[in-house]
Amino acid sequence: MEERIYLSMLLSTYGSLLTEKQVNVMRLYYDDDLSMPEIAELNNTTRQAIHDLIKRCHKMLLNYENKLKLVEKYKRNEDIKKDIKDKLYILKDKIQDKDNVQLIDEIEKDINSFSI
Amino acid sequence: MEERIYLSMLLSTYGSLLTEKQVNVMRLYYDDDLSMPEIAELNNTTRQAIHDLIKRCHKMLLNYENKLKLVEKYKRNEDIKKDIKDKLYILKDKIQDKDNVQLIDEIEKDINSFSI
């Protein structure tokens, strides 16, 4: 996975553990693709301060993932989810009974409501 | 949910964010039900030091849950999992075709392999 996308996922997952200012700067850098001088100007600070903040937060996010592995789990669960959905489609295709098809639709909805 | 069980769940979920010593003391207190003086003796320290450590870690665990809500999600996902399994049983009961039953068994296995 591309580094920038991965960092964006880490930020979505662990952003609540950072301060509002840290998240704000990280989003400008990783999601909005702004340069460090641009972010420094927006925050009325130096390029060096932004560089240090990004570096520190980067390290914190990798550390959280290293310990909790939520992004790794998320990716694994996404694969399982896709697998289940594929099987439900096959099953639905092979079943005629209307009530059973409805039950499968409900299972699919349940699968989508998992927060992973 | 009983306070002690809840704390035990928080500890299993966020223990990797604490130090080894902190987890050790918290497990003795919440899982093994030892008293503070007993834990103090085992750790060759004072009851007050253990009291402070437990209080601080308790606060940290609640803070992590307040921000990441992993235990809350876990409980919600467990309910969804149970719901899906109930529906799969109903479906299996109503289906005759052997291949379809096998497909349902596979879906059930997938559901169990979710790490939530």
Curated annotation (Swiss-Prot), chains A, B:
Gene3D superfamilies the UniProt entry points to: Winged helix-like DNA-binding domain superfamily/Winged helix DNA-binding domain
InterPro entries: RNA_pol_sigma_r3/r4-like, UPF0122, UPF0122_fam_protein, WH-like_DNA-bd_sf
PANTHER family associated with the record: UPF0122 PROTEIN CBO2450/CLC_2298, UPF0122 PROTEIN YLXM
Protein name: UPF0122 protein CA_C1753
Role summary: Might take part in the signal recognition particle (SRP) pathway. This is inferred from the conservation of its genetic proximity to ftsY/ffh. May be a regulatory protein.
Family: Belongs to the UPF0122 family.
Pfam families: UPF0122 (PF04297)
